[in-house]
């Protein structure tokens, strides 16, 4: 893909995101319009394409659940998740401050989380995902968001995050693993908090706090 086509793809993707979200939220409480946010994200992404930049994977969602594979620290191209033909993105406020975050992912690749802080685009995280597209949920009650990743057919990991003052904080990782049915028809479920086996009651306390009232945010795709 030549440089001109890459720039065109970035502009089309961001304009599509703006047109998708504007009917819902046209003006932000913080005083930044979505068109201004789109401009800042576009400029930053075009810079990263014109001057390719390597960044380290900040977290591997597989390893957070104690599963095999950990690419944390591996260097990857920053621009790739948002300019591939397989790119999917989310454009919405995940912190409750009225400023939209920008998430981009390639299935089986990395998930990039961007925000705008003090009128500058910041890379909050570069997450290694699994072969299955992760789901993103937002909880308006406490302004947290959750990235749910299917590690295997029997293991799901829910990583809870919060954005404050231009920084990303991971509050908890809730994982549940479904075991094999025994001869009596019982299917065991093991529950983990931050990679450690915990009781059902403790797991449910965290789940109720962060996940009970969350709503899914749909990905938009470059192929749509």
List each model region and its residues.
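Repeated scaffold domains used in trafficking and secretory/extracellular systems
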Residues: 131-138, 180-183
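Beta-propeller blade repeat segments, especially FG-GAP/WD-type strand-to-loop junctions
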Residues: 111-125, 161-165
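Calcium-binding motifs, dominated by EF-hand helix-loop-helix domains
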Residues: 90-94
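Acidic/hydrophobic-patterned starts of short beta strands in beta-sheet-rich repeat architectures
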Residues: 95-105, 141-148
């Amino acid at each position: 893909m030549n440089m001109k086509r890459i720039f065109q793809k970035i502009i089309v993707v961001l304009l599509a995101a703006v047109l998708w979200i504007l009917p819902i939220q046209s003006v932000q409480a913080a005083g930044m319009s979505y068109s201004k946010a789109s401009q800042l994200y576009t400029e930053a992404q075009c810079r990263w394409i014109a001057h390719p930049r390597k960044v380290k994977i900040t977290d591997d969602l597989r390893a957070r659940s104690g599963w095999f594979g950990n690419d944390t620290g591996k260097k990857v191209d920053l621009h790739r998740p948002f300019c591939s033909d397989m790119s999917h993105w989310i454009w919405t406020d995940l912190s409750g401050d009225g400023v939209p975050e920008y998430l981009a992912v390639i299935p089986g690749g990395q998930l990039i989380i961007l925000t705008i802080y003090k009128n500058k685009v910041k890379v909050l995280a570069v997450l290694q995902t699994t072969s299955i597209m992760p789901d993103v949920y937002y909880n308006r009650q406490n302004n947290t968001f959750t990235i749910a990743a299917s590690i295997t057919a029997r293991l799901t990991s829910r990583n809870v995050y919060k954005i404050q003052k231009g920084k990303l904080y991971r509050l908890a990782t809730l994982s549940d693993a479904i075991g094999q049915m025994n001869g009596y028809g019982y299917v065991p479920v093991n529950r983990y908090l931050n990679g450690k086996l915990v009781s059902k009651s403790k797991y449910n306390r965290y789940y109720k706090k962060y996940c009970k009232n969350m709503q899914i945010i749909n990905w938009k795709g470059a192929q749509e």
